[in-house]
Amino acid sequence: MKKFFLILILGLLLSNTSFAKRNITKSDFYNRIEEKGNMGFVLRYHNEKSPSGYEIVMPKNAPPIISDFKSKYGVLGGSRSDYGGTKFSAKHGGIDFYIKVGSPILAAADGKVYGVKVKDQCVGNQFAIDFGKSLDGKRMRVTHMHVGKIHVKKGDQVKRGQLIADAGALVKTNCGGGMEHLHFHMSKNKGSGGWGSFRFLGGPKGWLNPHEYWTGGKGKPECYVEGKEYPEGLLTLPVVCSEL
């Protein structure tokens, strides 16, 4: 009898573990969005707790983060070690925001576009902006990946809140993750070493955690509001918040 109960308990544990680690489907994702409301939460997988290092407080009307900085899991819950059919230890180098196809992508601060690439085999369309120095003196260079139409070109000066791109459709590549989203990747490195699709996983030197540089404080991103004054060296959300 003891042996029977031991086998039963082990079976239940294995079953629960298998369920917890399975990838959710796109349908599952939309169901969760509908149940919880599609604004203002950070979606977590596998009981992963604050991989960014901060408790994140999203505005109630902001699009959700579906894979956070340093997360081990992709936008649909799969392990990042499985990307491209390869096995390696990897953490997320940026923040993934779920946004609907065609939605506006905004400049997170004043800056200068220093890189543009379309139809990248890994991430689709992407571009990079130098937002200047942060309050702690680090250079804030941000790559925007998986986008649709890009409204800026290399060398353009941009203003905070300016329309810089449209959200792209589902990226049908090894790096798309199976869900449309904006990948917002921040680095202090210069030149080609500070941006590009090969920088979004792993652990290269120079990564910066965007959650340290929000205008609302660490872990407290704010929606851009036209006409409001913001301090230099800090970022507002690159995605549009809905009206409450």
Task: Identify the meaning behind each predicted range.
Residues 4-13:
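Sec-dependent N-terminal signal peptides
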Residues 16-20:
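Sec/Tat signal peptide C-region and signal peptidase I cleavage site
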Residues 21-125, 134, 160, 169, ...:
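Surface-exposed, glycine-biased beta-strand/turn segments
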Residues 92, 107-154, 170-183:
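Zn2+-dependent peptidoglycan hydrolase active-site motif and core
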Residues 102, 132-134, 187-191:
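Solvent-exposed coil/turn segments that connect beta secondary-structure elements
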Residues 145, 183-219:
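Short peripheral tails and domain-boundary helices/loops at the edges of structured domains
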